[in-house]
């Protein structure tokens, strides 16, 4: 390390130059396309569920293969180095170890991806302390590749953690791999990912203890929920657990090791009430010594090193020139520009203090540190001591000449910053918020007065801007005036912005910056230049609006429940610890005051009724003593948005138990109705079709105490919590509570030591959840919990759904309440859950929903996530006599049930009171399927007992001629078509029918056909009839269609179900290859369905399935028939 010594202070000056961006560790190409934010602002609805990743979503993910079969995951940390779990290699023989290959750039296991690279492994190093018989031994191995990978969009390394990277409990990270879709299935076809939080060691150890497992070791990391469930068991050993730094760079936090609590494991669960499954990962930050010790073996001297931990170019300076402050040395800064300075940077450190533009940033170890990189010219770096260290870190990317610093000793002084006084600037230069780029101070007021010569104007350009957002910038803001009296306001700015230049209209500009006491960001840096007045016309400047909120007020009817005027903003990706809420993002929140003092929170459910906790009002039930304030954010200020009402009547639930807090719910009737507007709106009550499940992410709001010994918060606070299983919550956290956690309670919260959960003053407030783009629904009322005194315990809420009948009976009138019924209330208010241009309506899940538009989209609740639990849905489309209906199944996933028909999607055609089953579908579809029906009525029903998801788009087409003129059912026999029996045969004729005979006795049958078309031809496969029936234990009968022959064949279609209507699945060749391998496997159960009953006797079908095929020139791809055009206007049934 460079050691600088002299008397006085040290001053370092650097000058920056433009730089280009190269491929770097920890960057996903999806970030650049989607502009993934550095700070999480979205609301998470459910995170412990596997989903398909994007193609370039995890470029550091690799597949470890033996004999071309995937067996584990891994992470690329360098061009020729991969880390994985040591246990992945335990069961392999010496011969198998020598034949391991690493595949990078892979997305699909069953087809070759564009950037896929297969590289043999030359050397394996396992951690010396790894022991396969110990749960908590260092489970890590380093693989050396025979040659380097080629980096690209789908192949990039992951960053390894630095010493100052802290992975805190509650931070949401990503796990990825080709884990099995279910316990008995094969690996997933495409790369999966799951978002899950880092778990507190103490909470993790509590769960591990209940399973008779040892506590978490120093080298292990725990992630997930105490009641994670079987989703955790589908992971991929050796794969990465990556977390994101504040600047957006991803780091490798963990390596998937094992899962505690999975069924079939060798370790019994001591307490059979515990349903936990926790992911245990090797903690990379604790294993950096092993990685760095072996990472650079074999590298040539002088070869650039990948960034691992802290490495510095070191040179000691024996003396420093002392100056009086008027002289300034010059330097050079030519380094990569990155948010957070993660890859290349130079920093200034000292043991007692560092000022960087009169700001300091304390590290956890008591030292102070600040990084500099990129091209933005920083002001002098000032250290308060006569000793300092200047570390320089660079990675392998050769993207700049580095830096040159001038070091001088100066006398201590306090330069004016414009904060607490007025700074007058008369020369071109820069100004910035105090402590920039660190967090600006609380309760700051700063003024800069820029004065140019006469006949000149001032150009103000913000090079960086991050100021806490609030509607109308009412808290933190930068205000720019065009006159010294501050009457001509040019702009009022807040949020995280990229702003164009602002030009003054005269030779004066005033910049005013203010901050409050909460949630500070890094502030701003602005450069100002002085230009001749006539140059203003050359630039044609576009002034920003006077107010620039990040989100505008949504154009939603005020009485529509659950829709806030502004989307909630979250400064952190953590789901532990509270923060100030975005003003008016929770418009149903009210404050309850008793004799003028704040007591509890509540939720608006209609203009005259408030829902709150019974314990808040039971002993103070005189309505005259209570006032209710709606539209409030800062309870210490009188805000123009407030509406104050007196209480008229208080109703406490008759079964409220003061000992157990069971039935802790109450209603307050207001003296006069609230006036709904953009900041005062009701919240939806839950609908019976959408129950609340464990691991869902919800939000709690209130003005409760920020700490156990602190006072109430002045501004509304918010916190994200996850829902726990009642049994897990009771037996893990509240086993001694009187009465336990009853069915009338919800347990929610993230167990993290030292974090605020719920405190005095939060009681009665709302627990709201939302499903994807749906409205917020009131599932709980804050009741009790030990979270304020013992932060590692979750909170407990009154379960609102249990009390719906009680609420209705007290309010006395169904018209007075709004439930989350998307079929009626929100059908036209909400966008569809997928960004499909054809989605004109989203009627939701009801006993029967009419599809009223000629085109639209309807899915299961929280599509694309699986709906968990019992669900019955039905949609009806009426088709006029001159139209056809086209249904396209965009997505189908009906898994997780041992009995096939526990989850089924059925399409019926109904004509003259007769119902005909057109299709009954199960399984999983990764492609679209199309149904055509003439109607007059088509009914789609969905039945699920366990889990499932689907999305269907539809359109009604106008038929200009007779309905059957262009679209007819294919005959099961034809004189001109070639009939193909069930055998392994090569088909080259241009068309034919493949038939499977129905056997009269129980048997297992397999049929395989291979179709080869001429060059520049395509193959169309039409399923005429394909019945599949379930046995007691499993669904039998599958049709799979592959592209190509042999080991390289690609699965492009898979069917299971009963398909009997006009179903056309076009299998079209997009490459020059022109062959399809069709493979069918049927397992028949004679006792179940070999024979079809008829009146008086049994009648056997001759054929079980019929499939027709045809080979056509490529230009004749299937088109919508010319006489089918989209229907206009409304639909009518025949």
Curated annotation (Swiss-Prot):
Boundaries of every Peptidase S1 domain copy: 38-296, 575-812
Domain of life: Eukaryota
Disulphide bridges, residue numbers: 72-88, 173-243, 204-222, 233-262, 341-373, 419-446, 473-494, 600-616, 698-769, 729-747, 759-788, 846-873
Propeptide: 23-46
Localization of this protein: Secreted
Glycosylated sites: 52, 99, 324, 431, 507, 1106
Family: Belongs to the peptidase S1 family.
Name of the featured protein: Ovochymase-1
Species of origin: Homo sapiens
């Amino acid at each position: 390390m460079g050691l600088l010594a002299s008397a006085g202070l040290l001053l370092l000056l650097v000058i920056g130059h433009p730089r280009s961006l190269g491929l770097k560790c920890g960057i996903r190409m999806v970030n650049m396309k989607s502009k993934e934010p550095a700070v999480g602002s979205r609301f998470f609805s459910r995170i412990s569920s596997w989903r398909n990743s994007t193609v370039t979503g995890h470029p550091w993910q690799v597949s470890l293969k033996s004999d071309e079969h995937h067996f584990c995951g891994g992470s690329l940390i360098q061009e020729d180095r991969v880390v994985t779990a040591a246990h992945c290699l335990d069961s392999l023989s010496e011969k198998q170890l020598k034949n391991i290959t690493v595949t990078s750039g892979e997305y699909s296991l069953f087809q070759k991806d564009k950037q896929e690279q297969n590289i043999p492994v030359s050397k394996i190093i396992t951690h010396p302390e790894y022991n396969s018989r110990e749960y908590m031994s260092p489970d890590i191995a380093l693989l050396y590749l025979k040659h380097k990978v080629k980096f690209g969009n789908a192949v990039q390394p992951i960053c390894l953690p630095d010493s100052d990277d802290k992975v805190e409990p509650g931070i949401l990270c990503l796990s990825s791999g080709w884990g099995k879709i279910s316990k008995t299935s094969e690996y997933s076809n495409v790369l999966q990912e799951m978002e899950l939080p880092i778990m507190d060691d103490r909470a993790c150890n509590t769960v591990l203890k209940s399973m008779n497992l040892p506590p978490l070791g120093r080298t292990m990391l725990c992630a997930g929920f105490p009641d994670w469930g079987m989703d955790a068991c589908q992971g991929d050993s050796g794969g990465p657990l990556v977390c994101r730094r504040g600047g957006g760079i991803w780091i490798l936090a963990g390596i998937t090791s094992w899962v505690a609590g999975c069924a079939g494991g060798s370790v019994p669960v001591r307490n059979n009430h515990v349903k936990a499954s926790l992911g245990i990962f090797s903690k990379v930050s604790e294993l950096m010594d092993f990685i760095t010790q072996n990472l650079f073996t074999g590298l040539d001297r002088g070869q650039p090193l990948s960034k691992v931990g802290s490495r510095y170019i070191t040179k000691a300076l024996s003396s420093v020139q002392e100056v009086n402050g008027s002289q300034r040395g010059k330097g050079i800064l030519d380094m990569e520009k990155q948010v957070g300075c993660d890859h290349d940077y130079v920093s200034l450190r000292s043991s007692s203090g560092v000022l960087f533009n009169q700001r300091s940033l304390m590290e956890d170890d008591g030292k102070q540190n600040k990084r500099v990189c990129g091209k933005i010219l920083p002001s002098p770096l000032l250290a308060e001591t006569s000793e300092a260290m200047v570390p320089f870190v660079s990675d392998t990317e050769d993207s700049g000449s580095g830096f040159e610093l001038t070091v001088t000793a100066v006398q201590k002084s306090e330069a004016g910053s414009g904060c607490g006084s007025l700074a007058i600037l008369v020369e071109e230069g820069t100004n910035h918020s105090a402590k920039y780029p660190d967090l600006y101070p609380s309760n700051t007021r700063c003024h800069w007065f820029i004065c140019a010569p006469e006949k000149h104007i001032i150009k103000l350009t913000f090079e960086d801007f991050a100021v806490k957002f609030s509607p109308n910038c009412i808290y933190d803001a930068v205000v720019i005036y065009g006159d010294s009296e501050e009457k001509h306001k040019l702009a009022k700015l807040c949020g995280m912005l990229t702003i164009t230049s602002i030009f003054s209209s005269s030779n004066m500009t005033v910049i005013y910056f203010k901050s409050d006491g909460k949630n500070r960001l890094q502030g701003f840096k602005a450069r100002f230049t002085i230009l001749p007045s006539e140059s203003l016309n050359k630039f044609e400047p576009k002034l920003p609006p006077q107010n620039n909120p990040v989100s505008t007020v949504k154009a939603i009817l005020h009485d529509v429940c659950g829709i806030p005027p502004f989307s909630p903003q979250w400064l952190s990706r953590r789901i532990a610890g509270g923060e100030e809420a975005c003003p008016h993002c929770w418009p149903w929140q009210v404050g309850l005051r008793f004799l003028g003092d704040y007591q509890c929170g509540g939720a608006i459910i209609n203009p005259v009724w408030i829902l709150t906790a019974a314990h808040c009002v039971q002993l103070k039930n005189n309505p005259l003593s209570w006032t209710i304030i709606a539209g409030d954010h800062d309870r210490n200020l009188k805000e123009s948005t407030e509406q104050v009402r007196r209480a008229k009547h208080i109703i406490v639930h008759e079964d409220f138990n003061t000992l157990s807090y069971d039935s802790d719910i109450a209603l307050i009737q207001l003296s006069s109705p609230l006036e709904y507007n953009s900041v005062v709106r009701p919240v939806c009550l839950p609908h019976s079709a959408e129950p609340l499940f464990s691991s869902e992410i919800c939000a709690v709001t209130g003005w409760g105490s920020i700490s156990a010994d602190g006072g109430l918060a002045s501004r509304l606070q918010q916190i994200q919590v996850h829902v726990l299983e009642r049994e897990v919550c009771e037996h893990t956290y509240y086993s001694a509570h009187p009465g336990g956690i009853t069915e009338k309670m919800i347990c929610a919260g993230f167990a993290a030591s030292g974090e605020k959960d719920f405190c005095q003053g939060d009681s009665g407030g709302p627990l709201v959840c939302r499903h994807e783009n749906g409205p917020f629904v009131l599932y709980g009322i804050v009741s009790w919990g030990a979270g304020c005194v013992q932060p590692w315990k979750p909170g407990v809420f009154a379960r609102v759904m249990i009390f719906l009948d009680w609420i209705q009976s007290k309010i006395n009138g169904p018209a007075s309440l709004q439930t989350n019924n998307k079929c009626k209330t929100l059908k036209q208010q909400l966008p569809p859950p997928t960004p499909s241009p054809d989605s004109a309506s989203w009627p939701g899940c009801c006993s029967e929903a009419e599809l009223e538009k000629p085109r639209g989209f309807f899915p299961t609740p929280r599509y694309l996530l699986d709906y968990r639990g019992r669900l019955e849905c039905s949609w009806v489309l009426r088709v006029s006599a001159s139209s056809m209906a086209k249904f396209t199944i965009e997505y189908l996933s009906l898994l997780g049930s041992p009995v096939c028909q526990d989850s089924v999607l059925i399409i019926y055609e109904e004509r003259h009171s007769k119902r005909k089953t057109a299709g009954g579908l199960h399984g999983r579809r990764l492609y679209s399927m199309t149904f055509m029906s003439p109607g007059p009525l088509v009914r789609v029903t969905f039945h699920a007992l366990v889990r499932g998801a689907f999305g269907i788009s539809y359109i009604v087409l106008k038929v200009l001629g007779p309905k059957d003129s262009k679209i007819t059912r294919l005959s099961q026999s034809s004189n001109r078509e070639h009939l193909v029996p069930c055998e392994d045969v090569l088909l080259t004729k241009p068309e034919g029918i493949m038939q499977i005979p129905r056997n009269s006795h129980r048997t297992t049958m397999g049929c395989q056909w291979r179709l080869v078309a001429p060059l520049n031809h395509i193959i169309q496969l039409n399923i005429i009839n394909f019945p599949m029936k379930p046995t007691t234990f499993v669904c039998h009968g599958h049709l799979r269609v592959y592209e190509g022959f042999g080991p390289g064949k690609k699965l492009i279609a898979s069917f299971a179900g009963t398909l009997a209507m006009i179903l056309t699945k076009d299998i079209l060749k997009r490459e020059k290859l022109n062959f399809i391998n069709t493979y069918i496997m049927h397992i028949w159960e004679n006792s179940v369905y070999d024979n079809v009953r008829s009146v008086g006797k049994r009648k056997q079908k001759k054929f079980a399935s019929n499939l027709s095929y045809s080979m056509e020139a490529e230009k004749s791809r299937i088109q919508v028939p010319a006489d089918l055009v989209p229907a206009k206007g409304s639909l009518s049934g025949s």
